[in-house]
Swiss-Prot record:
Family assignment from sequence similarity: Belongs to the aspartate/ornithine carbamoyltransferase superfamily. ATCase family.
Taxonomic lineage from the root: Bacteria, Pseudomonadati, Chlorobiota, Chlorobiia, Chlorobiales
Record text on subunit structure and interactions: Heterododecamer (2C3:3R2) of six catalytic PyrB chains organized as two trimers (C3), and six regulatory PyrI chains organized as three dimers (R2).
GO biological process: 'de novo' pyrimidine nucleobase biosynthetic process; 'de novo' UMP biosynthetic process; amino acid metabolic process
HAMAP family: Asp_carb_tr (MF_00001)
Function of the molecule: Catalyzes the condensation of carbamoyl phosphate and aspartate to form carbamoyl aspartate and inorganic phosphate, the committed step in the de novo pyrimidine nucleotide biosynthesis pathway.
Protein name: Aspartate carbamoyltransferase catalytic subunit
Enzyme class: transferase
Pfam family, one: OTCace
Catalyses which reaction(s): carbamoyl phosphate + L-aspartate = N-carbamoyl-L-aspartate + phosphate + H(+)
Pathway: Pyrimidine metabolism; UMP biosynthesis via de novo pathway; (S)-dihydroorotate from bicarbonate: step 2/3
Length: 308
């Protein structure tokens, strides 16, 4: 593996290797003080973000520092991109400065694969358009594996805006590769055409979807969808598809809940469901576990691509 531009095409053995490596790093993050071998000392990683980010950018920066690497943070607004510089020129100039790897977030689908085609340095996709977000899917896989002890045979339901979600796409690929069953639940306007051909079940009612699933991954609803004709209103979407305690209580069994963030509270997920980390109740929020696992997964990816 020379780059990580997506999970598509990666064998199960590679995903398991990354998850196993991340598990070791997660154990290290639980120790006080955190101490890790400086495997990437004297390496410099360019964090090239053309879109805003909190969790992904900071966790990559922490991951790099834990392994002894330095980081260079790039934002489009404060760079020569604001003066018209192209993506390819930006990458070539950073490469000429002898950076060792690129972590790229970009609004255009396929941007990471394009950058990988013009540089000899490893490229890690931190989210490109509606294409993929591979490290988010890996941290979700790690979170599910920690909770259940396995991935194979699980029934995972992805709830929300499937049509525009790179997180959904990478999760579907990763979960299927490791043997999980997958369902999606959304209004038909937020489902890709012919999604059933991906080998996933399709639900348009949340109660039936929850009854089927072992765990739920809730996606952020981009608020502009309410004015774009995809949903009647935020209120109606929340009433039909928002994950609430009342809907989960009808299951009478515990349901682990994941969300990639940022959260639209009381729209796609209620405060109670987002914040509950243990019973009483029938939901178990895994959101903070996901955040911690994000650092561990990104350490594993940097290790795999850069450690010699």
């Amino acid at each position: 593996m020379n780059h990580l531009t997506g999970l598509f095409g990666l064998p199960a053995s590679t995903l398991v290797e990354l998850l196993d490596l991340a598990t070791g790093y997660r154990e290290g993050l639980n120790r006080e003080p955190e101490t890790f071998a400086p495997l990437l000392s004297n390496r410099r990683i360019a964090l090239v973000f053309f879109e805003n980010s909190t969790r992904t950018r900071f966790s990559f920066e922490l991951a790099a520092r834990h392994l002894g690497a330095g980081t260079l943070s790039f934002t489009a607004a404060s760079s020569s991109v604001s003066k018209g510089e192209t993506l390819s020129d930006t990458i070539r100039n950073l490469e000429a400065m002898k950076v060792d790897a690129f972590v790229l977030r970009h609004p255009s689908s396929g941007a990471a694969e394009f950058v990988a085609s013009i540089t000899k340095r490893p490229v890690i996709n931190a989210g490109d358009g509606t294409h993929e977000h591979p490290t988010q899917a890996l941290l979700d896989l790690l979170t599910l594996r920690e909770y259940f002890g396995k991935i194979e045979g699980l029934k995972i339901m992805i709830l929300g805006d499937i049509l525009h979600s790179r997180v959904a796409r990478s999760n579907i690929i990763g979960l299927k590769t490791l043997g999980a069953e997958i369902a999606v639940c959304a209004p038909t306007t937020l489902l890709p055409g012919r999604i059933d051909q991906l080998g996933v079940r399709v639900f348009t009612g949340i109660d039936e979807a929850l009854a089927w699933a072992d765990a739920a991954i809730v996606l952020r609803l981009q608020l502009e969808r309410a004015t774009g004709g995809y949903i009647p209103s935020l209120e109606e979407y929340s009433a039909s598809y928002g994950l609430t305690d009342e809907k989960l209580d009808r299951l009478k069994r515990l349901m682990p809940v994941l969300h990639p963030g940022p959260i639209n509270r009381e729209i796609e997920i209620s405060n109670l469901v987002a914040d509950r980390i243990q019973p009483p109740g029938y939901s178990s929020s895994m959101l903070m576990e996901q955040v911690t696992n994000g650092v561990a997964v990104r350490m594993a990816v940097l290790h795999r691509l850069l450690a010699k």
